[in-house]
């Protein structure tokens, strides 16, 4: 697959997985967590941020800051998931992959989002390096080495 097709594919796939994670959090908010102090609003905030960033990712080629924000929202969701199963978050704890199947689906979409964003960033970096003109040493210096 050439780079001209890869970048739009990565952009669309990243936006899709980010939006899917947001949808799962919105669904959990409506079904279960809206009455949980602090946690409920955080689920709603995560869902809103995911939807907004997913939409912005689809509008042209986003700058690095936007991709970093998408990664940050995703990392925040994963950190909250891990913390809620270990030390707890604001007194809230859960165990295992409950609620099922949303916990597992959320883990998969968020891990997929991070993977896609990482591949996208590596591809953009390689493309920028390839576009630079190589620095050549003057002929005099090459002859003496």
Q: Residue locations for each model-derived region?
A:
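Membrane-interface extramembranous regions
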Residues: 1-145
């Amino acid at each position: 697959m050439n780079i001209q097709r890869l970048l739009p594919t990565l952009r669309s796939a990243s936006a899709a997985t980010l939006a899917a994670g947001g949808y799962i959090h919105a669904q959990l908010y409506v079904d279960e967590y809206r009455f949980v102090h602090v946690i409920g609003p955080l689920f709603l905030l995560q869902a809103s941020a995911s939807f907004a960033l997913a939409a912005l990712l689809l509008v042209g080629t986003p700058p690095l800051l936007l991709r970093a924000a998408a990664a940050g929202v995703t990392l925040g969701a994963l950190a909250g998931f891990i913390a809620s199963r270990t030390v707890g978050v604001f007194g809230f704890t859960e165990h295992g992959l409950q609620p099922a199947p949303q916990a597992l689906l959320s883990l998969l979409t968020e891990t997929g989002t991070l993977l896609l964003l990482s591949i996208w960033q590596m591809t953009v970096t390689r493309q920028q390096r390839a576009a630079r003109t190589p620095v050549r040493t003057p002929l005099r210096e090459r002859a003496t080495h």
